[in-house]
UniProtKB/Swiss-Prot annotation:
InterPro entries: EF-G-like_DII, EFG_III/V, G_TR_CS, P-loop_NTPase, PrfC, RF3_C, RF3_dom_3_sf, RF3_GTP-bd. One of its GO terms (molecular function) is GTPase activity. This is Peptide chain release factor 3. It comes from Photorhabdus laumondii subsp. laumondii (strain DSM 15139 / CIP 105565 / TT01) (Photorhabdus luminescens subsp. laumondii). GO terms for biological process: regulation of translational termination.
Length: 529
């Protein structure tokens, strides 16, 4: 295979997202990753609001003026010989289906765990999503500068709860006030921790070898001996690193450190660029597309709307799968069978929203969207194919939506269907009545929908509680059995925005009983876009 400039560009791309429970330290680790990638000169700390440190890195702060906060969505930075694309997954309040779908656009994930707490609920959910594509996972056990749980116990919990084998790459020496550093099992080096160096890249002292007298002198004989004994146990009880198992999502390399103290993040980044895959092939409804192909293909995984009614622009995020994007090129939008000239795609380099001239597989570009682009749309240079694996997820929160002005029913329905195509929310129309039920994954989605209905469709809507706790898409290969099911379960059936049959259950117990009663019916948690 000739190593053309194009192939070199593809080979150096690494595209990943960070998954964590709120407060496990995702914002801090994002900052430190950017610091090591020299994307920002100095990281602010989230704690030091009163000090001269900014609450976050400056450009993140600028994003707070509620325009399209696009720069925090995709950040590109160089690290060693690679070019890394970090896709942000929104945190607490902004948690939505976007968070899930972003994970379908990456080739690898970094799971950040608060080592004082272990595996938490949001992490479990996000890991379930990575399982849809067996995404490779690296793990960073964070907050070693605080008192943490036993490291072996933490790894056991990850293995048991998330069903993935753990392979420690670094191992902590103490924690909290007595945190001394980490030992790298594969380089046979100990790195010593210094406090108070969180916002700059520090020179870390490395001591080669476990039996080096320097180690005893640096951390004390007792701790050094304890470390040797611990490592004997660890090496006996844990998995060896196996690159193939990692690439198949079966094994996760585990790193220990403190993002706030800026320690251990670089070991994880070294592992990421060394082991994470370059842009991967993607399945379509016709064939598999390799990143090395010279014709451009890509898919839309997220649409970001503007909260400012003065600017209606929305940006559609496109993951480049193959070929090269060049400014002004003509692309074929497969779903609507139309050619479009893309003159002003956006890129996201270290926090600047700027126009892009070139993009390669693994890169994310932003397309201006005036309502013609939907999630799951495929763009090609003419070939008629559609990328698969961009799912809708069953919502977990439901509200009935009501109009202040009943004469605007038509506009309401139109608005909701369009917003559901964009992925802002899901809409369900029960077969048994004229209600409109809105479903979301994150609570903020409801507020966004009401605001956008008002500003874009001139519809004033309000919510009421509704007796729905979960929804599943319904499939059955036997038309007769499906008809019988529809007849008997009409009270619990609805059509979603794309007219797909959906079972809306008042309780999980109801759903489980219905499943048992109708074993031939498939109740699905995800549905292809």
């Amino acid at each position: 295979m000739s190593n053309s400039p194009f192939q070199q560009e593809v080979a150096k791309r690494r595209t990943f997202a960070i998954i964590s429970h709120p407060d496990a330290g995702k914002t801090t680790i994002t900052e430190k990753v950017l610091l090591f990638g020299q994307a920002i000169q100095k990281a602010g700390t989230v704690k030091g609001r009163g000090s001269n440190q900014h609450a976050k890195s400056d450009w993140m702060e600028m994003e707070k003026q509620r325009g399209i906060s696009i720069t925090t969505s995709v950040m590109q930075f160089p690290y060693q010989d690679c070019l890394v694309n970090l896709l942000d997954t929104p945190g607490h309040e902004d948690f939505s289906e976007d968070t899930y779908r972003t994970l379908t656009a990456v080739d690898c994930c970094l799971m950040v765990i608060d080592a004082a707490k272990g595996v938490e609920e949001r992490t479990r959910k996000l890991m379930e999503v990575t399982r849809l594509r067996d995404t490779p996972i690296l793990t960073f056990m964070n907050k070693l500068d605080r008192d943490i749980r036993d490291p072996m116990e933490l790894m056991d919990e990850v293995e048991n709860e998330l069903n993935i084998a753990c392979c420690p790459i670094t191992w902590p020496i103490g924690c909290g006030k007595s945190f001394k550093g980490v030992y790298h099992l594969y380089l046979d080096e100990t790195y010593l921790y210094q406090t108070g160096k969180g916002h700059t890249i520090q020179e870390v002292r490395a001591i080669k070898g476990l039996n080096n007298p320097e180690l005893d002198a640096a951390i004390g004989e007792d701790l050094a001996e304890q470390l040797r004994q611990e490592l004997e146990l660890v090496q006996g009880a844990s998995h060896e690193f196996d690159h193939q198992a990692f690439l198949q999502g079966e094994l996760t390399p585990v790193f220990f450190g403190t993002a706030l103290g800026n320690f251990g993040v670089n070991h994880m980044l070294d592992g990421l660029v060394k082991w994470a895959p370059a842009p991967m092939p993607r399945q379509t409804d016709v064939r598999e597309v390799s990143a090395q192909e010279d014709k451009f293909t890509g898919f839309i995984f997220k649409i970001q709307a503007n909260m400012d009614p003065k600017h209606r622009d929305r940006v559609a995020f496109l993951r480049v799968v193959s070929g090269q994007y060049e400014k002004g090129m003509k692309l074929h939008q497969v779903r609507i069978k139309k050619d479009v000239v893309i003159a002003d795609a956006l890129t996201f380099m270290a926090g600047d929203r700027s126009h892009v001239d070139h993009a390669y597989p693994g890169d994310i570009i932003g397309l201006h969207n005036h309502g013609t682009i939907q999630i799951g749309d495929t763009f090609t240079q003419g070939e008629d194919l559609k990328f698969t694996g961009i799912p809708n997820f069953a919502p977990e929160l439901f509200r009935r939506i009501r109009l202040r002005d009943p004469l605007k029913q038509k506009q309401l329905l139109k608005g909701l269907v369009q917003l559901s195509e964009e992925g802002a929310v899901q809409v369900f129309r029960p077969l048994a009545n004229n209600d409109l039920i809105v479903g979301a994954v994150g609570i903020l989605q409801f507020d966004v929908v009401v605001a956008r209905l008002k500003s874009e469709y001139n519809v004033e809507a309000l919510y009421e509680p509704v007796n729905v706790s979960t929804a599943r898409w319904v499939e059955c290969h036997d038309a007769k059995k499906l008809e019988e099911f529809k007849r008997k379960s009409e009270q619990n059936l609805a059509l979603d925005g794309g007219d797909n049959l959906t079972y809306i259950a008042p309780t999980m117990v109801n759903l489980n009983l219905t499943r048992e009663r109708y074993p031939d019916i498939n109740f699905r948690k995800t549905r292809e876009h």
